[in-house]
Amino acid sequence: MNESLVPLPAAALVGLLREALDSSLVERGVLQGFELLGDRGALWSSLDLDELERMASAGNASAQAELAWRHSVGQGVARSPAAAARWATASAEGGCAAGQAVLGWLLYEGIGLPRDHAEAARLFALASKQGEVRGMTWLGVCLLHGQGTTADPRAAAALFLKAAEKGSAAASYWYGRLRYFGTGIERDYTAAARWLQHAADDGIAEAQDLLARCRFLGRGTRQDRGGAVGLWRQAAVAGLASAHFSLGLCLYAGNGVAADAAAAAGHFRAAAESGLAGAMFLLGQCHVFGIGAPRDVDAGVAWYRRAAERGSREAEFELGECHALGVAGLARDAGEAMRLWRAAARKGHARAAVKIGHAYRWGEGVAENKPLALAWYRRAAEHGERAAHVWLGECYEHGEGSRRDPVAALAHYQAGALAGDPHGMAEYGRCLMAGIGTKPELREGEAMLREAAAAGWSQALDELARQRFVRGERLLLAAQDAGDPGLREAVECFRVAAEAGHRRAAFMLGECLRHGTGVRVDLALAASCYLKAAALPDAKLRLADIYYYGQGVRRNTVRALHWYLEAAAAHRDPYAMYSAGYCLLHGEGAPRDPRAGVHWLRQAALHGEADAQYELGLACFSGNGTRRSMRLATKWLRSAALGGHDGARDFLQRMALGRRLN
């Protein structure tokens, strides 16, 4: 499980935008159709109020319709639903198509009159028969959604087209919309873009919004993300929440416009305050992570909650993460995290399904249930979560929740790799190299591991090195003699693993080069290999000896002492402690330091190092770096002699005979 929260990356937001543009997230809904009122007669809309009232009072039905409309929306006059209903009724009773349309709209909205969709649809039909474009458009919306009449999207499309051809911008929008979604008529993005362009040119924000989708996705028109951003800006100025949301996503991700997190946050806020759940979630992200807005975790979590209450699966997932980790001011609560992840998963959130799978697999917040974990991973994979294939592969490989099935494991790792998941590439490459679920394919496996590393999965190189090292060791152990051809392959395996950073492989390559195993002797190259493996105690000792004895390099006792001391201090190696003590005692690689020399000799002697016991015995005999003590000298020399040290035995014999000793 993650140790900390991370914001959605820009690339993920582009994906979120594409998903939003193909969902109902940015659709305005039915009522917005009745906000698109279309063109009124230029004559009537241009009359001043006094002239209009005089004509209406004189019984002019068209003037009555216009006056009704102005009273209904408060245009140039105080808004008065009652006056609107009175004038619209008078106009409609006079047989005026415009009056019938306006009265129908009032009945539909319940403005000044009880809401009555059936009567509204009847009046729209009367107006439509007289060729009134608003009546046609509004009747089309009723037919589209089955409000006040039987739903008939095909008939709605025909009415929208007829009204659009008469110049109705509102009808152009609706017809373009039906063409875009293929509702009641064959989907045709090209026709959709053409009709939406007519409506957008007349300033209809909803048309600008949908046309922007066409431009952004290249549907029915050439892809032009900059042009899409321009249209969303126009629609956002008109206050369209979905346009604010889409524009915010583009600004956040720098798609079609220069990235501007502060501006993005502003548009998310505008859309969020209009009730758009996706915008609430992203505004929460901005506050939680301080992206384009002041960092305010409490405010961010509050927006997450509001978004979750409105059904945002992303917000539910993020709140689950907060509770699982006990961050963002929320108590650690595995049960609440599971509840939120379940809610998100029910809406198709694939990563939430993975989290639930993890919980059941490892018993975090719920009873461990491997088969159920497997089912959740499978669900996540079916919803497009490429990483889920890795977890499925692990379960099948190790028999978690199912019998062991290396072939199925390999198939899932391959699916993850083909989907571009770096972890999947690494696991697939490992299986190819190790022959899991298939015969070993070393070249293909190595190539896949390198591809995984290039894609950002750094552990892939470690796996490559491990696989090569293991094979190299097997070949080395299986070799029958010095001429075995497997030795050359072993050397190559060690070389590849060493280049990938495997220290033990670098050491083994050095050993092969030093002894001519599977390769000609090259002490200088061996030294460079030991240097790569210098974190290992054996490599430190090899380096020290190479420099001390001048094997393949110029003799350098300073460097030799350095590596002896490194091995002695870091690994407490008896030979290293003896060698460091010897050099310090005799002034090799550093000025003589008998006390320090005796210190290291004593440490090595206590570990049973015979050479150190011999040198320590001599030091005690002569008082070199320590007080003179025949008892201690005899003790250490006897220990060395028992360990097979000939010099110690000879010295003890001479002591016994009383001969002169140096």
Language-model features and meaning:
Residues 443-457, 530, 534-535, 628-646, ...:
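TPR/TPR-like (Sel1-like) alpha-helical repeat modules
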Residues 9-12, 29, 44-51, 464, ...:
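Structural recognition of alpha-solenoid helical scaffolds
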Residues 8, 642, 646-662:
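Terminal, low-structured helical/coil segments at or just beyond the last alpha-helical repeat
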Residues 39-46, 80-81, 116-117, 152-153, ...:
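Helix-turn-helix repeat elements of alpha-solenoid scaffolds
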Residues 35-36, 66-73, 102-109, 136-145, ...:
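Hydrophobic face of amphipathic alpha-helices that form TPR/SEL1-like repeat modules
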Residues 29, 57-60, 73-75, 80, ...:
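Short helix-capping/linker turns of helical repeat alpha-solenoids
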